[in-house]
Swiss-Prot record:
PANTHER family linked: 15-HYDROXYPROSTAGLANDIN DEHYDROGENASE [NAD(+)], ALCOHOL DEHYDROGENASE-RELATED
Top-rank taxon, per record: Eukaryota
EC number: 1.1.1.1
Biological processes annotated in GO: alcohol metabolic process
Family to which this protein belongs: Belongs to the short-chain dehydrogenases/reductases (SDR) family.
Gene behind the chain: Adh
UniProt GO cellular component terms: cytoplasm
Protein name, as recorded: Alcohol dehydrogenase
Keyword Nucleotidyltransferase assigned: no
InterPro entries, alphabetized: ADH_Drosophila-type, NAD(P)-bd_dom_sf, Sc_DH/Rdtase_CS, SDR_fam
Gene Ontology molecular function, alphabetical: alcohol dehydrogenase (NAD+) activity
Chain residues that bind substrate: S138
Active site: Y151
Catalytic activity: a primary alcohol + NAD(+) = an aldehyde + NADH + H(+); a secondary alcohol + NAD(+) = a ketone + NADH + H(+)
């Protein structure tokens, strides 16, 4: 899709990968960038506004773990103001296997609920125009970091959800693809808890291997947005953007 003159909602658009991606999106000239984030960061919002004064950047506080009804209410406020939204980016995520319920709530349920909520406004069966969902998942959805099985499983679940809704596009009019970053230099990976403390040095060990910067990831994210391939499974690793071919071992046949 062409980002210029589009309306974009970015959940967690002020995080590590999120903020650099917001910067790259703003440079591409959307009409509106609506940032939904749990933590308010006025300085970051001001920076985004200054980066391209032609873009209207708006912030709303949002915790993806709220009930579905609250998410729908917030989206109604946004749609009432913008009338149309072209792209929803779901980017909320935590990495802490000591917080099992919250990891699942943020990394998986939050993605499902926000996507489900926007269907009220996009689903062509309800007279909607359709739209595009970009879900930030992880390479751990391909192969887990086994020391953080809860995080890895939550990202695998988000990836599975995304590939499923992509296949429903002919019914709903809503397309989807997944963004799967490799190990990226963010606060998230500098220190985190393994499951049951099976490996206290997991973050340190992980960072001994090659990583990528948030800017590299963000620039490739924008390329994936522009490619706009329904059902694509994008790997953003070591500064590269690659489409993954998923190996099929079983098919429901329906």
């Amino acid at each position: 899709m062409v980002i210029a003159n589009s309306n974009v909602i970015f959940v967690a658009g002020l995080g590590g990968i999120g903020l650099d991606t917001s910067r790259e999106i703003v440079k591409s000239g959307p009409k509106n960038l609506v940032v939904l984030d749990r933590v308010d960061n006025p300085a970051a919002i001001a920076e985004l506004k200054a980066l391209n004064p032609k873009v209207t950047v708006t912030f709303y506080p949002y915790d993806v773990t709220v009930p579905l009804a609250e998410t729908k209410k917030l989206l109604k406020t946004i749609f009432d103001k913008l009338k149309t939204v072209d792209l929803l980016i779901n980017g909320a995520g935590i990495l802490d296997d000591n917080q099992i319920e919250r990891t699942i709530a943020v990394n998986f349920t939050g993605t499902v609920n926000t996507t489900t909520a926007i269907m009220d406004f996009w689903d062509k069966r309800k007279g909607g125009p359709g739209g595009v969902v970009a879900n930030i998942c992880s390479v751990t959805g391909f192969n887990s970091i086994y020391q953080v099985p809860v995080y890895s499983a939550s990202k695998a679940a988000a990836l599975s959800f995304t590939t499923s809704i992509a296949k429903l596009a002919h019914i709903t009019g809503v397309t989807a693809y997944s963004i799967n970053p490799g190990i990226t230099k963010t606060v998230l990976v500098h220190k985190f808890n393994s499951w049951l403390s099976v490996e206290p040095r997991v973050a340190e060990l992980l960072l001994e291997h090659p990583t990528q910067t948030t800017l590299q990831c963000a620039q490739n994210f924008v390329k994936a947005i522009e490619a706009n391939q329904n059902g694509a499974i994008w790997k953003l690793d070591l500064g590269r953007l690659d489409a993954i071919e998923w190996t099929k071992h079983w098919d429901s046949g329906i």
